[in-house]
């Protein structure tokens, strides 16, 4: 988290905390036919309610918000999170510990629904869900990402390091990778049926759920689009950035090795 982001983070955190839990629990009649699915880790349990509040306090509500936690966290749920549970928001538990749990179980439970995933350490803009849903209406069969990269190879066909995967939009939609932090919308049946094979996911991409789901989109023949009208940038929640899969994957070049494993196993062709 950058120093200049701290004042904004504190301001929006206090604003969200001032909202009454019972007001956020009620599902409005004009809600969108969307399920928001995310996960969290033990070190963020006392902060994730801020993210949930920002998701519940949207210009257009989702019909359901599911937070997936490991079953060992069941007896450690803070009151700040419990008071938000209601008609819209619920907490579910899983034996999984990997980040894949943000989507895999929701795909199993709601295969015919639009699912939007997000991260647990950010405050989301008031128009975040409404905007990504409008993008979905323009491309109803495509996966929509608010933030994307281009999987890139050099002239000899060698995969470039993740840091060199640019944000430029290529003509070849196959190379577009949606990044989870800012939000990804998955229409029904946009991923291969084997997307929920957690054992295979953990074998090939144990620390890169975005790469796993990208491979599943390719197998299904689903295009990925960069949102052209996305809300203002994410606001990091103060005190949540100490543990990050993103940093580990980039610093140790794990994204590269995991994508190679996926591409080799599934014979993925991005040309």
How should these model regions be labeled?
Residues 51-63, 83:
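Short, acidic, metal-binding catalytic loop of nucleotide-sugar glycosyltransferases
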Residues 33-37, 64, 212:
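Cell-envelope/extracellular polymer assembly enzymes that use nucleotide-activated donors
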Residues 35-43, 58:
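A conserved hydrophobic helix/loop-capping motif in glycosyltransferases and polysaccharide synthases
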Residues 63-64, 114, 223:
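Residues at the starts of beta-strands that form the adenosine-phosphate
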Residues 112-123:
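Short beta-strand-to-loop acidic/aromatic patch adjacent to the donor-nucleotide binding site
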Residues 1-19, 29-31, 47-50, 200-271:
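C-terminal catalytic/acceptor-binding lobe
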Residues 123-198:
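Conserved catalytic core of nucleotide-sugar-dependent glycosyltransferases
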Residues 68-113:
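Active-site-proximal specificity loops/subdomain of glycosyltransferases
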């Amino acid at each position: 988290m950058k120093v200049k982001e701290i004042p904004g983070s504190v301001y929006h955190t206090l604003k969200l905390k001032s909202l009454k839990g019972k007001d956020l629990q009620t599902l409005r009649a004009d809600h969108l036919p969307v399920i928001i699915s995310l996960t969290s880790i033990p070190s963020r349990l006392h902060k994730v309610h801020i993210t949930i509040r920002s998701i519940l306090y949207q210009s257009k509500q989702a019909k359901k918000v599911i937070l997936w936690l490991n079953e060992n966290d069941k007896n450690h749920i803070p009151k700040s999170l419990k008071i938000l549970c209601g008609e819209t928001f619920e907490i579910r538990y899983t034996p999984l510990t990997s980040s894949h749990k943000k989507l895999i179980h929701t795909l199993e439970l709601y295969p015919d629904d639009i699912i939007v995933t997000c991260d647990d350490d950010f405050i989301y803009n008031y128009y975040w869900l409404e905007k990504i849903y409008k993008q979905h209406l323009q491309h109803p069969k495509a996966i929509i990402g608010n933030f994307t990269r281009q999987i890139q190879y050099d002239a000899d066909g060698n995969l470039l390091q993740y840091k060199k995967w640019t944000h430029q939009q290529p003509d070849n939609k196959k190379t577009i990778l949606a990044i989870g932090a800012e939000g990804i919308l998955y229409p029904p049946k946009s991923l291969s049926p084997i997307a929920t094979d957690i054992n295979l996911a953990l074998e090939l991409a144990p620390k890169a759920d975005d790469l796993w789901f990208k491979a599943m989109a390719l197998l299904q023949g689903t295009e990925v689009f960069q949102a052209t009208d996305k809300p203002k940038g994410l606001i990091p929640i103060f005190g949540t950035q100490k543990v990050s899969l993103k940093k580990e994957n980039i610093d140790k070049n794990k994204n590269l090795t995991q994508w190679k494993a996926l591409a080799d196993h599934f014979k993925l062709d991005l040309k």
